[in-house]
A protein has these predicted regions:
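Conserved RNase H-like, two-metal-ion catalytic cores of nucleic-acid enzymes
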Residues: 5-6, 10, 16-55, 71-72, ...
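Conserved "right-hand" nucleotidyltransferase catalytic core of DNA-directed polymerases
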Residues: 231, 235-364, 379-383, 444-446, ...
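Function-dense linear segments that define catalytic or interfacial modules
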Residues: 348-352, 408-436, 445-450, 604-688
Length: 871
């Protein structure tokens, strides 16, 4: 049986993978889609081929012998995309970690290495499979050399296989003749000139008849069409050059020891570590290695028995830092102690070599342990956990002064990551790999160790990045404020919510009937395909080109049609009401607790700009634009004897823009409490202040807020339904009126490009990888974010400061009133009626003095018996 070798064209497959797999980045911001796609292709090939030997060849970024012959060789190629370029050294590191031989040589292309290696191996009696996305390699196909061309689309890979006979069947020429076809027709990808006027069909016919360009030249007067004959005579030297350029070397001067390419077990511990760092979780199942053989694990021990537990806590009380983890280890919870928490063990780390886990059994129930932990929280400098807010119910003695949340700290250092957990933090900040398949006890010990060991590491990094104060003075106190808000929740009138849903349902049924009547038939309004057929075929409305999936019925398409076609306006209303019913009327009902209140989760580690988000359910996206949407707020009510106080920052982002830009006119206007939108309209539209129309003021308002978000002329034209030219003039006049703003926004972009991040007044950083993208749309998006992130992020910081101060003051005065909701720039307080005036005074004072800016912060305040009235 013949031995088999697989030869992979490294750059070619990496390039294919890059464009075939959607963009991926790991938590460090490294693009990984090309590496991930490459590995998937390689594993597919290895699973199919099961080779004895494996080698990957790469191009070297340097001129080759072909460039010496023809300076413009590959001269038309665009530079490699930056996102792809940074992955080249990564894939080489991965391959070497897998003990896969990597070959590259200056002056030669990967194709020449493939040609030489395949030729040598065939001569040794081996079967060869060449994996390449470059069809030039088809010239290498023989009976024993197979060319495999992978195609990756949307992450799925298919492979075309070619032996010599397959090349002949597909292209009508032999692999060797394939070179001569290329010599005549040229190659735009490699900038091989070929013979002008000779395309693929003509070139193929000529070579089918004459086999080589040399033979064709000997019969040049017989060639057809006449133009090919004439041009081959005129460009004969160019044809010869093209053939040389297109010919892959079979005898390159390279050193190759076959034994170095032997393919045995690529799933090494080193490779496993790299896969973990690259966050290729789907590929880790291929490894049998023990990923968690870390030195730290030998210090893990389980503690049972009250005497031993008491000893552990006495030792822990003397420590400066303690890392703690709660584990839902259901297997260790006896029915007697299966309390509401669901936690089955607690783990502690109070020295690098003292990591214990305590199961909740007959000797140590959960309440006893949490009592010990709460007492411990008072005596240590740093009580550290991963996701501290989730456990504050069991730690009443813990404060923001000694509480430390490693997840929040890690988020500040990298706010672009989608998800944060102990394993990720350990890998990124401790260089510690934790196997996800571990038992709960071991995993809990690792989490406690991570919480302990990360404290000095994260504190140092926060200090180095100028965010230590942000963490200590804003983010950590906020953890406790958000916990209080979650515990408080907001009361919902269940019957009112039901009635609201019924009203929506009745109106939806009415709309369905009206839409069917106008369409002349019944159809599924929720089916884009059926809706497209009705609107664009039956009713013949103007539309974009039909695609494979049908006509687009997206909101932006229908919005343009609605003014002219009443049925479209009805469909848009139907969609809005259907969403209101499913998301709010029906959806909110599922979240009402036994106490009649909704306890939403407030998240501080999700948005890249630092804004707080709300989930389970999301109470921050309650509709405000349509009256039926706003009415949902009526179901949110204070408890008996209380009233809602809603306090909303007025134009906080514009005020921050005035402060940051130092624009004198805008600063003066805010100090004099002038109508900013009317003033902007007066300046932009060149009309006296007192003659500004309502429409002009509305348009100026859109410009004011659009500028904060780096709006383009196109975006503004869409918002205001005006021409792009008009929108560009509005923006131009705006910057003429407020020159300081233009200077500031330009500086935001240039600073972000130079530093790699945007920054708020409080030092919060938003990394800006988009600015380095080779994609124009991504770069443009990055520039808009660079303008907006300092403003939006500073607004987020200020509202957080206000929340902390308001909550602390309410508690300090022992008031019954509670802060229950935060929606961007708005705070909602459930105020005891007897404390109303005091609560309003606290809100006014703490919100308006949350930051000292060059312009005053202003708060709009309203009260009501429900959220609708208060808003």
């Amino acid at each position: 049986m013949r031995d088999k070798i697989v030869l992979i064209d490294g750059h070619s497959i990496l390039n294919r993978a890059f464009y075939g797999v959607p963009d991926l980045t790991n938590s460090e911001g490294l693009h990984t889609n090309a590496v991930y796609g490459f590995l998937n292709i390689m594993f597919k090939i290895l699973d199919e081929e099961r080779p004895d030997y494996l080698t990957v060849t790469f191009d070297v970024h340097a001129p080759t012998f072909r460039h010496e012959m023809f300076a413009d060789y590959k001269g038309t190629r665009k530079p490699m995309a930056e996102e792809l370029r940074q992955q080249v050294p990564v894939i080489k590191d991965v391959l070497r970690a897998m003990h896969i031989e990597v070959i590259e040589k200056a002056g030669l292309e990967a194709d020449d290495l493939l040609g030489t290696l395949s030729h040598r191996c065939e001569e040794k009696g081996m079967d060869v499979s060449i994996i390449s996305g470059d069809r030039d390699t088809l010239q290498l196909a023989t009976e024993h050399i197979k060319i495999r061309i992978p195609k990756t689309k949307q992450g799925k890979t298919e492979v075309e296989d070619y032996y010599a006979a397959d090349v002949q069947e597909r292209y009508g020429v032999t692999p060797k003749e394939f070179i001569d076809v290329k010599a005549l027709m040229g190659d735009t990808a490699d900038n091989i000139p070929g013979v002008p006027g000779v395309g693929e069909k003509t070139a193929t016919k000529i070579i089918q008849q004459y086999q080589t360009i040399e033979n064709a030249y000997e019969h040049v007067d017989e060639l057809k069409p006449p133009r090919a004959s004439k041009n081959l005579k005129e460009f004969w030297e160019q044809a010869q050059l093209s053939k040389t350029l297109a010919t892959i070397k079979l005898d390159a001067d390279i050193t190759f020891e076959l034994e170095n390419a032997r393919h045995e077990n690529p799933y090494t511990k080193e490779a496993h570590e790299l896969f973990q760092r690259l966050e290729f979780k789907n590929l880790l199942g291929r490894f049998d290695v023990e990923a968690s053989v870390n030195d730290v694990e030998k210090y893990f021990r389980e503690v049972t028995g009250k005497e031993e537990i008491e000893k552990v806590f006495k030792e822990a009380e003397k420590a400066e830092t303690v890392g703690v983890a709660f584990s839902k280890d259901a297997g260790n919870v006896l029915p007697l102690f299966a309390h509401a928490s669901g936690y089955g063990r607690v783990s502690l780390c109070y020295e690098a070599e003292k990591i214990v886990t305590i199961p909740c059994d007959m000797d140590a129930d959960f309440e006893y342990l949490t009592g010990k932990l709460s007492h411990l929280a008072k005596s240590v400098k740093r009580f550290s956990m991963c996701g501290l807010k989730e456990y504050l119910e069991w730690l009443p003695e813990l404060t923001s002064e000694n509480g430390f949340d490693v997840i929040v700290a890690a988020y500040l250092l990298n706010p672009l990551k989608n998800d944060y957990n102990a394993e990720d933090v350990a890998r990124e900040h401790l260089n510690l790999l934790i196997d996800e398949k571990l038992d709960e006890g071991t995993k809990s010990c690792y989490e406690a160790y991570t919480a302990y060991a990360c404290v000095p590491v994260l504190e140092k990094k926060l200090e180095e990045n100028g965010m230590f104060r942000l963490f200590n003075e804003i983010e950590m106190p906020l953890v406790f404020t958000l916990y209080d808000m979650e515990q408080a929740g907001v009361k919902v009138e269940g019957e009112e919510l039901k009635r609201y849903g019924e009203e929506l349902g009745a109106r939806i049924v009415e709309l369905e009937k009206e839409i069917y009547e106008m369409a002349g038939e019944e159809f599924n309004i929720n089916s884009p395909k059926q809706l497209g057929m009705i609107l664009f075929e039956k009713l013949e409305m103007p539309h974009a080109k039909k695609t494979k999936t049908g006509y687009s019925t997206a909101a932006d398409v229908l919005d343009k049609l609605a003014p002219e076609y009443p049925i479209v306006a009805k469909i848009l209303e139907y969609r809005q009401l259907a969403k209101l019913k499913s998301t709010y009327a029906d959806g909110l009902a599922n979240y009402i607790g036994m106490d009649g209140r909704i306890h939403s989760k407030f998240n501080q580690t999700i948005t890249a700009t630092g804004r707080i988000s709300s989930t389970e359910p999301n109470l921050q996206n309650i509709p405000v634009r349509m009256e039926l949407g706003r009415l949902i707020r009526k179901v949110f009510v204070p408890k008996e004897g209380c009233v809602f106080v809603d306090a909303d920052y007025s134009q906080i982002e514009l005020r921050i823009l005035a402060h940051c830009s130092g624009d004198e006119q805008l600063i003066q206007a805010y100090r004099e409490a002038r109508d900013i939108h009317r003033m902007t309209a007066s300046q932009v539209f060149h009309v006296p202040f007192n003659e500004v129309t309502d429409l002009q003021r509305r348009n100026a308002k859109a410009v004011n807020f659009g500028i904060v978000y780096g709006i383009s002329s196109f975006g503004l034209s869409q918002d205001l339904s005006i021409s792009r030219k008009e929108a560009a003039q509005y923006i131009e006049h705006y910057f003429e009126s407020y020159p300081g703003i233009k200077t500031f926004l330009d500086k935001c972009v240039s600073d972000a490009k130079e530093k790699g991040y945007a920054e708020t007044l409080y030092g919060r950083r938003r990394p800006m990888p988009e600015l380095k993208s080779s994609n124009f749309m991504q770069r443009s998006f990055g520039e808009r974010v660079a303008m907006n992130a300092p403003i939006q992020g500073t607004a987020a910081d200020i509202i957080k400061i206000a929340m902390i101060h308001v909550n602390e003051e309410l508690k300090k005065r022992n008031l019954k009133s509670r802060m229950i909701l935060q929606v961007h720039d708005e705070l909602l307080i459930e105020a005891d009626e007897r404390e109303l005036e005091e609560v309003q005074q606290i809100l006014q004072d703490k919100m308006e003095h949350a930051a000292e800016l060059l312009v005053p912060l202003s708060v709009d305040m309203h009260t009501g018996k429900n959220w609708y009235e208060a808003k």
